[in-house]
């Protein structure tokens, strides 16, 4: 039983990383529609994950920059919660992460910070701090 649970955990982690890589690819291709699809999968399968929070923040900011009226107010309100989740994950140790996952987390952290700073410089404040 323990071996089966271990296998499921490894499979789940790889599936989550694959989604994170998919989001990064769609972000780099600037494809908002496909980014939304990946974000929806995160919300359905890994709602509390670091990558889900980061992907959602990045997607909402990009959508807001494209057209502020496309972003419902409740999504904007949730940004500060997601940002706190990201900050919490960033305080956790990264010793157990492999090189690929560490690089992916660094990319996500960098993109979240860049996008949040850009929007805050334009007068929209996400953080509740």
Tell where the protein language model's regions lie, with residue ranges.
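Long, contiguous interaction/recruitment modules in multidomain scaffold/adaptor proteins
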Residues: 1-10, 127-128
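Secondary-structure boundary/capping motif
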Residues: 34, 38, 45-49, 56, ...
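Short coil/turn linker motifs that delimit alpha-helical repeat modules in TPR/alpha-solenoid proteins
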Residues: 11-12, 31, 45-48, 74, ...
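Alpha-helical segment of the N-proximal tetratricopeptide repeat
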Residues: 14-41, 45
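Alpha-helical repeat scaffolds
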Residues: 37-42, 69-92, 129
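Amphipathic alpha-helical repeat scaffolds of TPR domains
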Residues: 13-24, 50-67, 99-121
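Short solvent-exposed coil/turn linkers within tandem alpha-helical repeat scaffolds
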Residues: 44-51, 89-102
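Charged, low-complexity interaction regions
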Residues: 32, 68-73, 94-99, 124-127
């Amino acid at each position: 039983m323990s071996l089966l649970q271990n296998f499921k955990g490894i499979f789940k982690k790889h599936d989550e990383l694959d989604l994170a890589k998919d989001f990064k690819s769609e972000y780099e291709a600037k494809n908002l529609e496909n980014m939304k699809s990946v974000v929806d999968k995160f919300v359905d399968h890994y709602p509390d994950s670091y990558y889900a929070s980061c992907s959602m923040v990045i997607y909402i900011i990009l959508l807001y920059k494209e057209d502020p009226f496309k972003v419902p107010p409740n999504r904007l309100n949730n940004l500060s919660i997601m940002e706190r989740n990201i900050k919490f994950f960033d305080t956790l140790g990264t010793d157990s992460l492999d090189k690929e996952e560490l690089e992916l987390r660094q990319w996500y952290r960098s993109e979240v910070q860049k996008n949040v700073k850009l929007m805050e410089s334009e007068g929209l404040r996400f953080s509740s701090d």
